[in-house]
């Protein structure tokens, strides 16, 4: 309801449904509420592939994207079995662009919020959605390349000023 009251507003949603240690952080009721009330009012959704599968189980990636009823969806991937990873930007159910990066080894905490924050900042500065996703991914990649491990925990992105 709050988002409806302050429209127009560009809402970017990072649906944190799974922790970096693969712990489920969601419930069916919460997912349904996000799908019904939040996603249709959002400009961009940034799920990783595992979260997309939780949001729309049993569907292909393109079917899942279409079912979420959000204008733009940036699906991020981190398949550990591959050398290269590919993120995909959709407008409705149409694949608009693929972004390819070399896989960075390790487990990370904070990559999704780094990405969504970077995209938000770029949109505020006037970038269009495709440019904001491109530069936001590049910034996040640099932060992950410089990530530090705290003890035996996951790596944490080092968020420093970065100019693409």
Residue ranges and their predicted role:
Residues 95-109:
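Short pre-catalytic strand/loop immediately N-terminal to key active-site residues, enriched for Gly-Thr
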Residues 130-164:
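Charged C-terminal helix
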Residues 105-129:
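Short, small-residue alpha-helix embedded
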Residues 1-37:
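Glycine/small-residue-rich loop that forms an oxyanion/phosphate-binding "nest" at active or ligand-binding sites
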Residues 24-96, 130:
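Conserved phosphate/ATP/ADP-binding segment of small-molecule kinases
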Residues 17-19, 51, 77-80, 102-105, ...:
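Glycine-rich beta-alpha junction loops
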